[in-house]
């Protein structure tokens, strides 16, 4: 496990997921990628600086997200870990596309219920990520997380295409 993806929208459960990812990364000397999706009213990437000023709320939202990502990055780097941060417009890439592109070995995400926080970020929910991810996924909910884990459930349908988790 050398590359961990942590999608976040900076909620409490996503913060718990980030903390767990840092603990796992320390254990396995892994790199962490923190990923945040943001909804913008226009195609922000193609917008020039002068036109950006027409959207002060979006500028504020992007600035806040960048500051939160920097804080997560600092937390990981203070533990001696390599870390990268990514921020995309909602339509730019899906979480699973990002994970595939960067060949993540693991995804750790927060969830606040059956819909999950990721639905608010990218239009997909945690269940979709768990079902469609090609790598193991840990979903952090409201309960207290005690690491290291005492037990882990590995779910499989035992079909031929199932591969080793690690």
Can you say where each PLM-predicted feature lies in the sequence?
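A short acidic, glycine-rich active-site loop
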Residues: 53-67
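Glycine-rich, Arg-bearing micro-motifs that act as flexible, cationic patches
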Residues: 109-128
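Short beta-strand elements of ligand-binding domains
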Residues: 108-111, 136-142
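Local beta-strand N-terminus motif with an aromatic residue
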Residues: 1, 104-105, 135, 149
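Structural beta-alpha unit
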Residues: 73-107
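Small/aliphatic-rich secondary-structure junction motif
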Residues: 1-52, 151-166
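General small-molecule cofactor/ligand-binding pocket signal
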Residues: 33-35, 84-88, 138
């Amino acid at each position: 496990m050398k590359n961990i993806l942590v999608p976040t929208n900076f909620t409490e459960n996503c913060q718990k997921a980030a903390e767990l990812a840092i603990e796992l990364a320390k254990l396995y000397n892994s790199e962490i990628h923190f990923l945040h999706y943001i909804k913008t009213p226009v195609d922000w990437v193609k917008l020039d600086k002068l036109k950006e000023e027409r959207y002060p709320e979006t500028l504020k939202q992007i600035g806040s997200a960048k500051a939160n990502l920097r804080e997560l990055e600092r937390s990981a780097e203070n533990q001696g870990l390599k870390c990268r941060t990514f921020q995309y417009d909602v339509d730019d890439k899906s979480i699973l596309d990002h994970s595939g592109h960067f060949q993540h070995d693991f995804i750790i995400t927060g969830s606040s219920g059956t819909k999950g926080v990721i639905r608010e970020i990218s239009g997909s929910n945690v269940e979709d990520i768990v079902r469609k991810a090609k790598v193991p996924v840990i979903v952090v909910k409201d309960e207290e997380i005690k690491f290291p884990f005492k037990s882990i459930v590995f779910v499989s349908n035992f079909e031929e295409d199932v591969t080793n988790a690690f």
